[in-house]
Structures are given as C-alpha cells and as structure tokens.
C-alpha cells in the first residue's frame, strides 16, 4: 500500500480550488506515471493489479462559494460546545459536554452520574436545544439513530461512522458546505466529514491484471475493493469484508 498524503495536507490548507492543490495534483500525475513505468519494467505490464482511491472528498472553501453566490460557511464547534454546556448547566447544574469531534458531541458519564442525573434525560435535553439552531440539519442520539427521521443514505453513512465506546453520544449534520473551521475572510482551506456527496466523492480506479478498459455508472465504495479482488482471484472474502465485487 502506498499512501499519498501530501494531497490531503495541501487540500486542507489551501482548499479544493487552490493553485497549490492544482500544483500538487499535476506533480502527482507525473509521479504516478513514473511509478507505473517502474512496475511495467520490474514486474511486467499485465502482471500486477493496481487500485487508486481515497478515503474522502472535501467541501469547497466557503469564501470561494460566497464569491460565486453559493451557500457555505464555517461551523464554530468551540462555540457550539460552550453554548450547549451553558444550556445544560441551567437545566441540570452541570457542564457535561467534554467536546466535539468529527461532528459528534462527547459527554462526561462520571460527571452526570456524580450529579445524580439520568444520562438519557441530559442527552434528550441537549438534542432538543441543538435542534433549535438552524445550522444543524439533523441532530440525533447515536443509540437511537434508527428512529431518527432523515434520508436513508444519510442515516446509513452516519451509522457507518459510529463505533461503541469510541464515538460520541450525539451526532449531527450541518447544512451543506458548512464545516468546522475558523470564520475569516482570508481563510483558504477546507475540511470534510459530512455525509454529503462532495465529501464521499472519490476516485475508484483499477488497472492492470485482467482489467479491460471500461467504466461503470453504478455506485461503488472503498469497501468494494477487497470484494472485487477476491472475486477476481476466486477466493473467499475475509470476514470483515462488507463490499460487493465490481466485475464486468
């Protein structure tokens, strides 16, 4: 596995439309061409199978969007935690929100228990408060996400990002093209992490051994890579494989 991490770092710093991002992809194109030439020489054309993909896409820089009269903006997660804690202090006498990360709010179980409060009541109150803020499109209890009213594709993607004991108690979806960043007129960067298509739109390319030229319009995901390789090799997929083979 070869990780090409410079595109991620530069994309975060300068945005999807930045000239710096353009430059790094032009250089990457040359590097990939050299890499394929070396494989052809050392391994032999048709004797290797190569996949090219990514783990996420990205939103456009919100200042770029504003310049083109399109919606977008910064989500101030620090202020969100502060406002939520202030509200919960009025309601329960405690500030149990430890922080926000990856569009999830994390709660201090020990603080809630020590105060003699019921955690579910605290979470429900927090959700009711957050839902009043128009910057949130959906706010939900991760333990009850199946009961939440939101489109299936968003619900599925948010559920896929949940892991017990590691994820937060409350998840949320901001308005499209709004992401956690500083709010400044000179901000050039961007981020990702929401279930919208621009965050999940990635390359999915395969090249080499037993791969004919072609394309498909069907939806594919990173999870399909392992399933596809197993299908090509005619072997059983590993226990953790949840994708579908993309075979033509």
Regions found by a protein language model. Give the residues of each.
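Secreted, luminal/periplasmic, and some membrane-associated catalytic domains
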Residues: 19, 30-178
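Active-site His/acidic residue clusters
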Residues: 1-28, 34, 66
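Solvent-exposed, polar/charged alpha-helical surfaces in well-ordered, non-transmembrane soluble domains
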Residues: 26, 30-37, 124, 128, ...
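Substrate-binding rim/cap in mid-to-C-terminal beta-strand-loop elements of soluble/periplasmic
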Residues: 79-116, 190-233, 247-248
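Short, surface-exposed loop/helix-turn segments at secondary-structure junctions
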Residues: 182-191
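Extracytoplasmic/secreted cell-surface and envelope-processing proteins
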Residues: 10-13, 59-63, 114-115, 181-183, ...
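Soluble non-cytosolic domains of exported or imported proteins
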Residues: 19-26, 116-121, 216-223, 240
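Short connector loops/turns at beta-strand edges and beta->alpha or beta->beta junctions
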Residues: 5-10, 177, 201, 207-210
């Amino acid at each position: 596995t070869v990780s090409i991490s410079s595109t991620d770092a530069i994309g975060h710093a300068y945005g999807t439309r930045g000239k710096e991002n353009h430059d790094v992809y032009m250089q990457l194109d040359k590097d990939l061409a050299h890499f394929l030439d070396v494989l052809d020489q050392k391994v032999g054309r048709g004797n290797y199978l190569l996949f090219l993909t990514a783990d996420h896409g990205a939103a456009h820089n919100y200042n770029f969007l504003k310049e083109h009269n399109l919606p977008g903006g910064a989500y101030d997660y620090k202020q969100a935690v502060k406002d939520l804690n202030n509200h919960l202090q009025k309601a329960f006498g405690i500030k149990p929100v430890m922080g926000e990360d990856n569009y999830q709010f994390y709660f201090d179980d020990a603080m809630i228990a020590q105060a003699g409060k019921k955690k579910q009541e605290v979470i429900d109150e927090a959700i009711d408060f957050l839902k009043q803020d128009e910057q949130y499109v959906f706010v939900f209890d991760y333990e009850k996400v199946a009961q939440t009213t939101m489109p299936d594709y968003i619900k599925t993607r948010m559920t896929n990002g949940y892991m017990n004991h590691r994820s937060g108690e409350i998840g949320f979806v901001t308005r499209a093209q709004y992401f956690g960043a500083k709010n400044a007129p000179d901000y050039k960067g961007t981020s990702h992490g929401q279930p919208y298509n621009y965050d999940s739109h990635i390359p999915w390319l395969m090249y080499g051994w037993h791969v004919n030229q072609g394309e498909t319009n069907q939806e594919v995901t990173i999870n399909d890579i392992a399933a596809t390789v197993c299908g090509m090799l005619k072997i059983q997929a590993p226990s953790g494989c949840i994708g579908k083979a993309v075979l033509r």
